[in-house]
Design a protein with these regions (language model features):
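Alpha-helical membrane insertion/targeting regions
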Residues: 1-205
Length: 205
């Protein structure tokens, strides 16, 4: 039993479960804290009133992607429930298209008021999110399974990046680095480039 617990495969499995648990908890916190925006009250929406429908599309689509994403990447679920996997995959793609489109509009309207670095970094993240999702869908249609799995994983990394950067702004360490306008662009960049790099290094190893 001791040898099994120290085996690389066992440690990798436990690490994946730990990462999955952290992602699910962080996503749940993010979803709960975003629900107040659906009150449609101007005093709650603030500067987002003119683009509220894009904001709602971004949040609702993002929620759909967050919920369906883990089951798409879970190999046991894919093998056992293929029809459900396809249906959930369509929901995921539609959710990302809505959410990424909303993010691009928000990055063009609300974000420049914070800083151009923040606006540009959000544009890039939303484009990567949308692009990787469409490539995951395209490779699935062509039955290029290995490529599909890789692009689907990259897509979900971009999905989680929106949660990661939103929660990172509330960390005391990030707050000490500077004002929101000063650190926002860097935080958004790091939220997806670091995990994306780590995934591709692990994939090629």
């Amino acid at each position: 039993m001791r040898d099994r617990r120290l085996s690389p495969r066992y440690l990798e499995t436990m690490l994946r479960r730990l990462v999955a648990a952290v992602i699910l908890i962080a996503s749940a916190v993010f979803v709960v804290r975003a629900f107040h925006l659906f009150t449609f009250r101007p005093e709650v929406l603030g500067k987002y009133v003119p683009v509220r429908w894009f904001l709602f599309g971004h949040i609702a689509g993002g929620m759909a992607a967050l919920v369906t994403g883990p089951f798409q990447l879970w190999r046991a679920s894919r093998s056992r429930y293929r029809r459900a996997h396809r249906v959930a995959g369509r929901v995921y793609v539609v959710g990302v298209v809505l959410a990424a489109s909303g993010a691009l509009v928000l990055a063009s309207t609300a974000a420049p008021g914070v800083s151009w670095a923040y606006a540009i970094s959000l544009h890039v993240l939303a484009t990567v999110w949308l692009g990787s999702t469409l490539l995951a869908w395209r490779t699935a249609v062509k039955r290029q399974i290995v490529k599909h799995e890789a692009w689907a994983t990259r897509s979900y990394i971009a999905t989680v990046a929106f949660v990661a950067q939103a929660l990172s702004f509330e960390l005391p360490l990030v707050a000490r680095l500077g004002t929101f306008a000063e650190v926002a662009g860097t935080v958004v960049w790091l939220s997806w480039t670091v995990p994306m790099f780590a995934y591709d290094v692990r994939r090629e190893a």
